[in-house]
Amino acid sequence: MSSTNTTPKPGNPIVYLDLAFGSSPASRPGSNRIVLELYADRVPRTAENFRVLCTNTSKLASTGQPLSFRNSIFHRVIPKFMIQGGDFTRADGTGGESIYGEKFQDEDLTGKHDVPFLLSMANAGANTNGSQFFITTVPTPHLDGKHVVFGRVLKGKGVVRRVESVETVASDRPKEDVKIVDCGELTGDEVSNQTYGIEQDDTGDQYEDFPEDQDDKLESDVSATYHIGLALKNMANTQFSKANFDIALEKYSKALRYLQLHPILPEDTPADLAANYTTLKTSIQLNACLCALKTTPAQPRVAISNATAVISNLTSNKAPSTEQADKNKYHSDLAKAFYRRASAYVAQKDDERAEADLKHALENAPEDAGVKRELQALARRKEAKLKGMRAAYSKMFS
């Protein structure tokens, strides 16, 4: 079946996985949803195993845990390869269980891993299928004949890419949990009209969530990438002005993914385009930082990451030109970055780092009343904490 054909074969089950990325909320209903077609016409036993693990709400595994993907995590992520989940008993790749018992046999190994976004069974060798699965993010022909391909992604390729791009630690495990918070089967109009329970994005965004799925030419076209980034920033600004902070942050983050296609601009990039590209990226990072502090709940780690990127870029590059306008913008952007990172540290109750950043902000914007107020508030908190400690110590020796 063609990877570009989004119409499922009649009779094949359509299931979904709704994900949560750490504490980050979905920007709209269904925006973190992966919709999958199961190849019941080719591998009915394997497809039924996955379908039931998506829909079961009562049956228990032999461990006494729910026989379901719900509340399990993606425990293994390897960029440019695959994302793996389905271990709902141990969450580390050593557990899981099928609806037929602990393991079941390979049904058909002739399916090809020839395109991205295929759904395939993870195993520990021949005939060791359980509940663990993986979704490919590139063609993986070396897996042919070893793993059962039993489905494909119909919708939510950007969600798969987002999982693929998360920060990982030892054993390729995501640093923050990527959890399947809900799962089930879709039928009726949601399938026939291909909405799949996903609320429509009404921002006018027609771009793929990740640039690698948009156009191969972008990697060699700085101008086209810049204009997509600019368009996405404008969409985000509109949502920000409407206080739709979750959607705005989604668009700012997406714009940065596109701009990151060119972390170092080619030497032949026109000077005005190079300057505009850098300015746009800094502006989006600063906006994303502010936006992350306004979402519910706030996302201080996202704010810190974006502010740190701005600070690193501005302080590692050559000094601003002698033009007063350039110098003013340089110090203004640095002040914003330090102030917003300080605000994120305050949200994390890390006043020591917040104080250091606020002092840096004041160095770059000596007359900024907001920075001064926050420093005063921080000093009051510090004094109150010291008084509390003194009172506690005095009681110990009274």
From Swiss-Prot:
One of its GO terms (cellular component) is intracellular membrane-bounded organelle. Residues 21-185 form the PPIase cyclophilin-type domain. Its EC number is 5.2.1.8. One of its GO terms (molecular function) is cyclosporin A binding. Its main location: cytoplasm. TPR repeats lie at residues 229-262, 282-323, 335-368. Gene3D superfamilies: Cyclophilin-like, Tetratricopeptide repeat domain. SMART domains: TPR (SM00028). One of its GO terms (biological process) is protein folding. It holds the Pfam family Pro_isomerase. It catalyses: [protein]-peptidylproline (omega=180) = [protein]-peptidylproline (omega=0). InterPro entries: Cyclophilin-like_dom_sf (IPR029000), Cyclophilin-type_PPIase_CS (IPR020892), Cyclophilin-type_PPIase_dom (IPR002130), TPR-like_helical_dom_sf (IPR011990), TPR_rpt (IPR019734). It is found in: Cytoplasm. Keywords: Cytoplasm, Isomerase, Repeat, Rotamase, TPR repeat. Belongs to the cyclophilin-type PPIase family. PPIase D subfamily. PPIases accelerate the folding of proteins. It catalyzes the cis-trans isomerization of proline imidic peptide bonds in oligopeptides. PANTHER family: PEPTIDYL-PROLYL CIS-TRANS ISOMERASE, PEPTIDYL-PROLYL CIS-TRANS ISOMERASE D-RELATED. This is Peptidyl-prolyl cis-trans isomerase D. It comes from Mycosarcoma maydis.
